[in-house]
Amino acid sequence: MDTNFWLERWQLGHTGFHQQEVLPLLQKHWHALDLPKESRVLVPLCGKTLDMHWLASQGHRVLGVELSPLAVTQFFDEAGLQPQRHTSAAGEHFIAGPIEIICGDAFALDASVLADCTAVYDRAALVALPAELRQRYLQTVYVQLPTHCRGLLITLEYPQAEKAGPPFSVDATHVHALFDAAWQVDQLERRDILDQEPRFRDEGVTGLSTAVYRLQRR
């Protein structure tokens, strides 16, 4: 899997992973992080998720990172926003009100870009990556987040042998293996969602759950 894979998905409109509404699990559990309203929230591999609008509505500043220029322009166009733009080493920045999206490679982020992010919302990034890329992703993104940063991580769990990702299965054992050295990890919820995801059942998946974790940087 490389950058062209995701760029092509957006160009061809193969974006079944995009949700047409704010994720209810975000609305249910976000306040468990107990963040000040002015906190800056990182949303890696953000696509054009409506969750960013909801986070902004909570008084937060939002920093999305997205590889696809098409996803970024669609996000602002569909909201009727005309972002200001400038370029840095991280990529092209699109800014409208409290929302900023960097169109660039999340694996090339510099620590200075993340220095004032006091929270991270990861619904679509970790599960989008195959196992061999996850440690690199943590080293590129999570390791560079400031001490005491908090996060909400949402994963999927299913028998990986029954379906090729993405999205990939990331179970609790793997979450703890990735994060425990530097983060306190607390599972807030785990629920069966196979009945709500017919495309997984249609592909032969026999069990599907989603899990929500609260993260606290040590």
UniProtKB/Swiss-Prot annotation:
Report the subcellular localization.
Cytoplasm
* Primary localization: cytoplasm
Q: Do you know which InterPro entries this protein is assigned to?
A: SAM-dependent_MTases_sf (IPR029063), Thiopur_S-MeTfrase_Se/Te_detox (IPR022474), Thiopurine_S-MeTrfase (IPR025835), TPMT (IPR008854)
- Enzyme Commission identifier(s): 2.1.1.67
The entry's S-adenosyl-L-methionine-binding residues are W10, L45, E66, R123
Q: Which Pfam families match?
A: TPMT
Q: Which GO terms describe its cellular component?
A: cytoplasm
State the source organism's domain of life: Bacteria
Q: Which reaction does it catalyse?
A: S-adenosyl-L-methionine + a thiopurine = S-adenosyl-L-homocysteine + a thiopurine S-methylether
Tell me, which GO biological process terms does this entry list?
A: methylation; response to metal ion
**What PROSITE patterns does the annotation carry?**
SAM_MT_TPMT
The molecular function terms of the Gene Ontology recorded here are: thiopurine S-methyltransferase activity
Q: What class of enzyme is it?
A: transferase
What keyword terms does UniProt attach to this protein? Cytoplasm, Methyltransferase, S-adenosyl-L-methionine, Transferase
Per its UniProt record, what NCBIfam families does this chain match? PRK13255.1, TMPT_Se_Te
UniProt family annotation? Belongs to the class I-like SAM-binding methyltransferase superfamily. TPMT family.
- The name of this protein is Thiopurine S-methyltransferase
Taxonomy of the source species: Bacteria, Pseudomonadati, Pseudomonadota, Gammaproteobacteria, Lysobacterales
